From Swiss-Prot:
SUPFAM superfamilies: MFS general substrate transporter. One of its GO terms (molecular function) is sugar transmembrane transporter activity. The chain crosses the membrane at residues 17-37, 66-86, 96-116, 119-139, 150-170, 174-194, 257-277, 292-312, 319-339, 350-370, 393-413, 419-439. Keywords: Membrane, Sugar transport, Transmembrane, Transmembrane helix, Transport. It is found in: Membrane. The lineage of its organism: Eukaryota, Viridiplantae, Streptophyta, Embryophyta, Tracheophyta. It is a multi-pass membrane protein. It comes from Arabidopsis thaliana. Signal peptide: none annotated. This is Sugar transporter ERD6-like 10. Pfam families: Sugar_tr. Sugar transporter.
Length: 458
């Protein structure tokens, strides 16, 4: 009976949400706010930058896509840096790249400094996209892990909202300085938050694992069971594998790798990067006011992200991903139909509003699932021994595919507005099958329980 009571007390400690967990999450997700600002920046600043620096459409498309190119570089080294430096110091490095990138854009006198800043910003957000969800997943109690991890998407959307709302009325250089400001919070804040206990276990700092857990769960919490579970699972995985790059291709990890890469391909090939970067071009083509569209969109993006944050630990990951795929596919299809009707000169008075409404539909469903859950699931499904290599490959997939979409979007859109969105709708339909057949539910399980079930480790 005493053993049962102790287990109950330990479970209660594991579920505790402390001020330290909240502070640590806040410090980490400030980087995601800058990520959101970077995503929305090209849409709001497009006209002013092209006019002041005399850029062609090809040059501006390249500038927009360099965020993804830099992101691919950051993603390639993100996992290794997170192991060598730890999660906290990697967060610090992310923000140094972002600060340099934003300031380079803000003071750019020519396209070279503009592009250099965008690439540096990309490297920073590429590191961010890996280390922030991993750090949050490793420090939070399992029953709220999804909601806390989803806060990254909330902050990203807050950054997008800020840029969309003010981008058409604030000078593009001032806008870049505003984008840099949140990056200073993690630069200072990392000195006040604990390191990930799972990273500490991996490097063999047994005493520090318990110290970190005590800060996260409370000084009076009994963290012995959680610390033991982390250390046993980490040791088991390390003994089972020498942690080489090729380990992730073992049969037992095949499903997790396919799921991680597949979700990132879905996220990018559904067109989100292109639509976010160049939404003003879509409004212009549809005949809808760019300023009004940007401001309404800016107000809309935050509540839609809140919905996903509230539902992720109630409904689970799979239902939200499935609903997201259906909604995005329908939204893309209806935008394509709108541009088809426009080309046929049918219902011209309704086309602008219809396109705008369906862009909101698309992004509403994007936000509750495919927008952020692939990163959350990536941070959950890979065991510590392959998290570096597999996580880096998955992040690299996202950024390289995002570069392809963001660079090619303007050219595709000029070729055929409706054809572009029909392609995105088709991707949404295929993603529904992929999610239904392969993606596991991760809600309510500890990372160790989840990874054991996926790999068959006992």
């Amino acid at each position: 009976m005493e053993e049962g009571l102790l287990r109950h007390e330990n479970d209660r400690d594991d579920r505790r949400i402390t001020a330290c967990v909240i502070l640590s999450t806040f410090v980490a997700v400030c980087s995601s706010f800058s990520y959101g600002c970077a995503n929305g920046y090209t849409s709001g600043a497009e006209t002013a930058i092209m006019k002041e620096l005399d850029l062609s459409m090809a040059q501006f498309s390249a500038f927009g896509s360099f965020l993804n190119l830099g992101g691919a570089v950051g993603a390639l080294f993100s996992g290794q840096l997170a192991v060598i430096l730890g999660r906290r110091r990697t967060l610090w490095a992310c923000d140094l790249f972002c600060i340099f990138g934003w300031l380079s854009i803000a003071f750019a006198k020519n396209v070279l400094w503009l592009d250099l800043g965008r690439i540096s910003l990309g490297i920073g957000v590429g590191l961010t996209s890996y280390v922030v969800p991993v750090y949050i997943a490793e420090i939070t109690p399992k029953h709220v892990r999804g909601a806390f991890s989803a806060s990254t998407l909330l902050l990203q959307n807050s950054g997008i909202s800020l840029i969309y709302f003010f981008g058409t009325v604030i000078n593009w250089r001032v806008l870049a300085v505003i984008g840099a400001l949140p990056c200073f919070i993690p630069v200072i804040g990392i000195y006040f938050i604990p390191e990930s206990p799972r990273w500490l276990a991996k490097i063999g700092s047994v005493k520090e694992v318990e110290n970190s857990l005590h800060r996260l769960r409370g000084k009076d919490a009994d963290v012995s069971d959680e610390a033991a579970e982390i250390q046993v699972m980490t040791k088991m995985l390390e003994e089972d594998s020498k942690s080489s790059f090729c380990d992730m291709f073992q049969k037992k990890y095949r499903r997790t790798l396919v799921v991680g890469i597949g979700l990132m391909l879905i996220q990018q090939l559904s067109g989100a990067s292109g639509i976010t970067y160049y939404s003003n071009a879509i409004f212009r083509k549809a005949g809808f006011s760019e300023r009004l569209g940007s401001m309404i969109f800016g107000v809309f993006v935050i509540p839609k992200a809140l919905v996903g944050l509230i539902l992720v630990d109630r409904w689970g990951r799979r239902p939200l991903l499935l609903a997201s795929a259906v909604g995005m596919s329908i939204g893309s299809l209806l935008i394509g139909v709108s541009f088809t009707l426009q080309e046929m000169n049918l219902f011209p008075e309704f086309i602008p509003v219809f396109v705008f409404i369906n862009i909101l539909v698309y992004f509403g469903f994007f936000a509750i699932g495919i927008g952020g859950l692939p990163w959350i699931i990536m941070s959950e499904i890979f065991p510590i021994n392959i998290k570096v290599s597999a996580g880096s490959i998955v992040a690299l997939t996202s950024w390289t595919t995002g570069w392809f979409v963001s660079y090619g979007f303007n050219f595709m859109f000029e070729w055929s507005a409706q054809g572009t969105f029909y392609i995105f709708a088709m991707v949404g339909g295929l993603s529904l099958l992929f999610i239904w057949m392969l993606v596991p539910e991760t809600k309510g399980q500890s990372l160790e329980e989840l990874q054991a079930s996926l790999t068959g480790t006992t």
